[in-house]
A protein has these predicted regions:
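Active-site nucleophile/metal-coordination loop of metallo-enzymes that catalyze phosphate/sulfate
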Residues: 19-32, 40-208, 218, 305
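Ser/Thr/Pro/Gly-rich low-complexity, intrinsically disordered segments
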Residues: 2-3
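Short, hydrophobic/glycine-enriched beta-strand segments
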Residues: 30-37, 274-277
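Long, well-ordered, tryptophan-enriched scaffold segments
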Residues: 179, 184-268, 281-286, 291-303
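Short, surface-exposed beta-edge/turn micro-motifs
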Residues: 270-272
Length: 305
């Protein structure tokens, strides 16, 4: 597909060039911005589709026209050092025409600047939930991928909530797409190291179900019914549960929504929910299901939280 696109780009340039010459007798400077998402530059050939493919049109452009390389990761595009880039980051920086500080480092900086202690809305909610003897449900992609969320932000929030004597329930969404396919055990090891146990993990779901953004509401409903009504497979130990999924060749992304045997669901009168993805597109459907009074994409028994 890319080769065909480049083929036509070259021919369009030639046609426009000839038409311009005939009409005005002059050549006007013209520019076409053609973004090839995922087309990287590397000398490594193993597993490198770009390097291994026959790319005569692309090679023609490189050989016949001036070119330069752009750094698309890390501080050059407003990300932390060595943090991989992604399409949103690339498009944002290209569109702005300058380096744009992205959400990931901005939020990390806010955490280090005592943001939580100074957040009046958060602390008011904490006080109210404590009075009602309720719990905070944290919903987010527990991943170090840095595209939709970052586990460090989730961990910092959990530390703060526990410090304020709040009962925390983590609805752990697994990645496997912006990370390696089987990375969730490493995420759980970090949780156990920081907090001593995994007992507060209330549910586990692959992002395929929890983070759909294309109105495939059957997926969102599975996740919703798990975290609200405790439906789905039950687990006792999260690590054992994940190992069982791997033994069935189910990677993180596609783990079906499942729930802890000790979890009792969401109490709409006492509990609160915090969504931890900083990129909103894949949290929109589940947040509407939980919070929107006019939600009607699938049946919900309870009032919005």
């Amino acid at each position: 597909i890319v080769q065909h696109q480049l083929y036509w780009v070259i021919h369009i340039i030639k046609i426009e060039y000839m038409c311009e010459q005939k009409m005005n007798g002059k050549i006007k400077n013209q520019t076409i911005l053609c973004i090839l998402d995922g087309w990287g530059i590397s000398k490594v050939t193993k597993g490198n589709a770009v390097k291994l493919a026959k790319t005569p049109n692309f090679d023609y452009l490189l050989y016949n026209f001036p070119n330069a390389n752009l750094i698309t990761y890390g501080p050059s595009v407003g990300l932390p050092k060595n943090q991989v880039g992604n399409s949103e980051v690339g498009h944002m920086n290209l569109g702005a025409g300058r380096k744009v500080q992205m959400d990931l480092p901005r939020i990390s900086q806010a955490f280090s600047n005592n943001f939580l202690a100074e957040n009046k809305i958060l602390n008011s909610s904490i006080a109210n939930i404590n009075k009602r003897n309720g719990a905070i449900h944290i919903i987010g992609l527990c991943s170090d991928g840095g595209v939709h969320s970052h586990e460090d932000h989730i961990f910092e929030l959990i530390k703060y909530l526990k410090k304020n004597n709040l009962r925390v329930l983590l609805h752990m969404i697994l990645d496997g797409r912006d990370t390696s396919p089987k990375n969730s055990l490493n995420n759980m090891k970090k949780i156990k190291f920081l907090f001593g146990d995994l007992d507060f993990i209330a549910s586990i779901s692959g992002r395929y179900f929890a983070m759909d953004r294309d109105q495939r509401w059957d997926r969102t409903e599975k996740f919703y019914r798990t975290i609200v009504y405790r439906e789905g497979e039950k687990f006792d130990d999260p690590e054992t549960f994940i190992k069982k999924q791997y033994s069935k060749e189910i990677n993180d992304e596609f783990v079906k929504p499942s729930v802890s045997i000790n979890y009792s669901g969401i109490d709409y009168k006492r509990d609160g929910v915090i969504f931890m993805n900083f990129r909103s597109d894949r949290m929109r459907q589940i947040s509407h299901a939980l919070c929107d009074e006019n939600f009607n994409n699938f049946f919900t028994y309870s009032k919005p939280i």
